[in-house]
Amino acid sequence: MRIIHFIILLFSIVISAHAQTSRLDSVHTIRDVAVVGVRPHYLTPSQTLAGTALQNLSTTSVADALKYFSGVQIKDYGGLGGLKTVNVRSLGSQHVGVYLDGIRITNAQNGQIDLGRYSLSNMESVALYNANRNERLQSASEYASAATVYLQTRRPDSTALSVEYGTGSFGLQKLKAYLSFKNILFVDAEYQRTDGDYPFRFQSASEDTVGKRRNSDICFYRIEAAGFYKGFTAHAYYYSSERGLPGPVVRRLSDQWDSTDRQWDRNFFVQSSYRHAWDRFSLKTNLKYAYDWLRYLQDPSTNAATMYCDNHYRQQDLYASASAAWNSSWLSLTASTDLRWSDLTTDVYRSAYVYRLDSKSLLSAIASYHGFEGNIALLYTHIGDHSARSAQSTAALSRFTPMFLASWHRHAFTVRAFHKRIFRAPTLNDLYYTLVGNAQLRPEYTSQFDLGVDYKDRHLHLALDAYYNRIEDKIVAIPMKCQFRWSMVNFGLVKSLGLSATAGYDRTWGKFSASASANYTCQRDRDYSSPHDPEYRNTIPYSPLHSASIIVDLGYDGWSLCTSWLYTGERFALISNNRDDLLGAWQTVDLKLNKRFRIQRHSLQATLECNNLGDSRHEVVKRYPMPGRNWKATVQWQF
């Protein structure tokens, strides 16, 4: 199959070479202008928070923003330092690709992307696409996810320096500095710490009392910089943190059962992208290197119920891609190829060094004619693992996966449909980890079918989608001889049937502006693994039937008030669907008041936030209580 990658690469080179020699007949050459964004998308369902609407939300991380999207479930393992992952339409977090400026954020070890560590302070937009976004020039990796989240860095529109200080509940202290040069460069640095010792209510058959969350602290600093020049962009990022890992609330509230596990993270990446367009041809290249280091400590001297564990993990990731497209007035042809090298080293007992080579190639055609638009794509994936112990290496994996999208657009109305079949390979943890690995795992497949209608004019946007998902050979962890030994297995079939609705409105009258958006999802996820199992047709854990959100944003002469409401219905914590494992519905209301003062050429911005205004005591994940009402105040001075 290597010949396929060679043909794609050769096609890309031929296209770019031809474009460099093509004449510009009857075309006036103008200076280069950098444009961020894509043309209107009609083919796939999408949701976006951008600009002022994004900054006015009472949110600090990407995970906080995504929870307001239709069909999204955020798994939050409690506490301000807990892991936060995203799940779209119950496909699983490892089927969701997260892209920063068009380049994927990866984790070769377990596939889980912790969205809590990515700040919104320098983001222009956060967008969610079912299937993938409708852009002419995409890398092969962008087609390799069932759903995609795009984080677009904000390009600086002025030369300025700003400093920010914030304080809040549970010992929160935040210091931030931002330096920008118009259209060229920004540097963003942040330090934050919090004790995370919030109160919670604990109820069981034998007690009903109020406790205080322990080991939920986090201290981190982050520094990143991005540069822009014509079609070239570069981004560097470094993140360092120490955090407590708040365990589940079990047995009685005593120090003996409090989790004392600690985790240290060091994350670094540098990436670049270059894009150039000629008359009918366009070319894009991406390059990225990432280094991740993690230490996990479990110390029985601080918790007698645990065993000693002090493990270190190091991951490296090197990625390169090239994409080329030919465009006419009604047809666009794209060819792209990607290559990713990932390795994992650890001091876990009897774990061998392993690295993975992942190559992808894509052929795509998009046609438009009198309001009709269609996209056909074929993705080829080849994955090979290599280990110092050859017996542990799995056989190479090669697959073709298709995608079909179609839409009809007339004035403000759009009718669209898509089908996409994709798979995810088992992670290195799934295959090779000493206690849980299973080298015989098969890839996990998802098939998506979607039919939707969309209406959009200057002020109003309405969308309605009905969808059906099918997940085969789902990779799950099950206990073996004892609770301390688990194994990864392929298990069963999951079917999902859902309906999602979104509505948005925005208007400006002089100095007054108003915007509102609402999302609602009704989704049923059931297990169809075996008719002989007692769990047959049971509801999948953590998949509520109903979920909804509303955001209202008002602005007047430098003042802005944003309120957001989030609702999640009842759901089960286990596949057995026992009443004891039923988690109740919950809802929260957040408020954010902001005022900007102009002082000569400078500005002062004061912000007051209240999260969980109604003091809702709830659990997103069973036995991981979430914070109640909490406050935050921030002051920012911009020079």
Predicted regions and their residues:
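Periplasmic-side early beta-strands and strand-to-turn transitions of outer-membrane beta-barrels
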Residues: 134, 150, 158, 178-262
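Extracytoplasmic beta-strand/coil segments of soluble accessory domains associated
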Residues: 63, 67-107
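Conserved C-terminal beta-signal and adjacent last beta-strands/turns
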Residues: 179-180, 217, 221-229, 365-367, ...
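Face-selective signature of the C-terminal outer-membrane beta-barrel domain
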Residues: 187, 224-243, 263-394, 398-409, ...
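Outer-membrane beta-barrel signature, preferentially recognizing the C-terminal barrel domain
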Residues: 258-277, 392-409, 413-414, 418-472, ...
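A beta-strand signature from Gram-negative outer-membrane beta-barrel systems
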Residues: 120-160
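N-terminal periplasmic "start-of-domain" segments of outer-membrane beta-barrel proteins
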Residues: 27-57
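Gram-negative outer-membrane beta-barrel transporters
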Residues: 327-334, 368-373, 467-470, 489-575, ...
